[in-house]
Amino acid sequence: MLGATALGSQAKAWARHDTALKSSDSPGLPLSVGRIKQSASRWCYGKIPLPDLCRSAKQIGLSAIDLLQPEDWQVVQDNGLVCSMGYPTKRNDFIATGFNDRANHAMLLRELEQTIPIAGKQGVPNVIAMFGNRKGKSDAEGLATCVEGLNKIKALAEEQKVTICVELLNSKVDHADYQGDHTAWGAQVIEAVGSPRVKLLYDIYHMQIMEGDVIRTIRQHIGHIGHFHTGGVPGRHELDDTQELNWRSVARAIADAGFTGYMAHEFVPTRDPLTSLAEAFKTCDV
């Protein structure tokens, strides 16, 4: 538990970024000097109590906390931030059990039907979903089955103004057998569903591992993307000079493409976590 001690240790780091940081008692001020709304994934900062994380994130300049269960949404809202991506449920097999298997549809639809109206009421703009593990399915079969399932929930998402973001993950290092492991395939699903409320969660860490060519891919598919996650390659650590990507250039490409959603930092800090988060914010604040 870091709490107030961690907050105090951040004073020097925050001072270095004084053009971007806004105090938590000045809600009328913009949270960012740049064009991208930035967020922090909750699980990467699990040792920090959520209210403390919210206060720290707001001081750094972030506007949201990402990947929260519904019981935590109000905590974030009470601290003047947004839950940028909500979970529809708690399940150990959440990633593997996705829309590419018709046997999962009843459960997935029930979870989303219960959660989307709550998200709409509480101002949560996005909920996360998964394509699921391949388990021998062809690309064509998985695509058709995903479209079939997502078509059954898109009307509710449109009605509630909540976007279902289906995540792209790598199957090479972290999630063996995951079917949604290439942008072009995921974009075909989104195109076939044809709803402004069903989009891709483009995880830059995962797609750099699988296919690279990140900036061109983002430009090509920006209309299919509803949300971004960051994470350095290799290792899923800080967005610094140990990584393959020029993160400032990536962020600038996203902003230049007219993206208005959230970029959530989902890296595992190797140093002081809030200092690393402040540095990532500054890097991507374009």
What positions do the PLM features span?
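Conserved beta-strand positions in the central sheet of alpha/beta enzyme cores
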Residues: 64-66, 85, 128, 165, ...
